[in-house]
Amino acid sequence: CFMGNPWVALRDAPFSVVAGLLDRGMIGQVGWDMIRLHLVVLPSPLVMSSLPKYQEIYRRFRLAIDQGQLGPGDRVPSVRSLALELKIARGTVEAAYQLLVSEGFFEARGQAGTVIARTLPQVAMKPQPVAPPPTSAPPALQMGQPALDAFPRKLWARLVTQQVRRTDADSLAMGDVRGAQALRVAIASYLALYRGVECTPQQVFICSGYAGSLTLLCDALQMAGQRCWYEDPGYVHARQLLRHQGVELVPVPVDREGLDVEQGIQRDRQARLAIVTPAHQSPLGVALSLTRRQALLAWAQKQGSWVLEDDYDSEFRYQGQPLAALKSQDVHDRVIHAGSFSKMLFPGLRLGYLVVPAALVEVFGRSAEALQQRGAQLLQLTAADFLEQGHFTRHLKKMRQLYALRRGFLVAALQAHCADFLRVDEQAGGINLLARLRVPVPDQVVAMAANEAGLAVNALSAWTLEPGGGQGLLMGFTNVATAEQANELGLRLLQILRACHP
């Protein structure tokens, strides 16, 4: 059907044409090579990637979308066609497609096929920096990254294999928009036992990470144009998403006792929502005091407002037991509890959840149906097994011990080499450190210099909504595996600090 060199014709053909030919069986390996070109794949074949195959398929499609090589409305191969070309199980391709659908990048149109979504999430609307190869270690001092070297990959792979072997036709379907029932049951059981949160599986909604949880919440509570208390400083990426959803943020200061509820009331008593990280404030690491918890719940009950509890880093507490969830103290049912497995297991999981009050189950269910943020069933069922079989709690116990050790490595190195420039804040838990600047140099200048030198340091001031929040550096320690590595990082940071403040 092409004149001249077929490879040249395929190279210049629109992706939708190539996908259509592939679906009709009219092209073979050349067709897949063309698809690889469009997806900007690595030279190594799919089977050589260190990622699970479904994640590698997902990654390649995301990269092509982010770089603008696949656009809204472009057709993609059917699950069956792509599985045949790659010589892999249909369930593997289905898992990748479900993940892309749940995040809003694909639209499944039944017998009409699957296409790139007409309206892409904002993150995909402009080219993004190319991610490092999957074999690369996380950037030094990167925040929010669990210890990937300590994740039980063989165990996880075995659970995935077991799930695939017992997969039936129903399991390959799109699944419930609220999430796999087995995972919702497992989460409800875990929260009751370890976080003091009593709920039914019907109150649990599985989302695509914390961002997916916020998107569902904003839709269900109709937050566009509404005001929301937001911790200052607070999680910068959530702040961006909320603004994109049309939420008007009311900055509320954070001190040693957490969110200053009285300040929130003075600034906007009638705010519809408050978002808090009560167990381990992001990024300062303080816990919301009992007095402040009671005041926050009383305000929500009196005003008819809602509180979103982001249970951020609650499981990683190195001094004493994990603090009780705010939801466990919520007698008037005004708290929506949010959790995520990404920082406890691995970021690529993209698995978060919401526990909503019984009165909101129907409302959130309608929003879930409208948004169609379906997650990959295979991932959800594997995570359910991981929880139900006790692997999750054992993994957390191991990680607490490991993180306490690695935290000590980095603190010691910073105190040994950078004490003239930095003062490390004492924190009872979490997977990040905050080091306050002792010298009069803007933290964003230091952070930029550190980033250019390969250190993924964040400036504290970038996390604030109002000026005067202090100057400091935020850094992760979970992948600082040895004291020697910590010392090397401390010396590199010292050189940067000296250059910024000679």
Explain the meaning of each model-derived region.
Residues F2-Q163, T167, L172-A173, L183-V185, ...:
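N-terminal basic, amphipathic alpha-helical segments
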Residues Q111, S328-V363, L378:
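Active-site PLP attachment segment
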Residues P233-V236, S461-L465:
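Short, polar loop motifs at secondary-structure junctions
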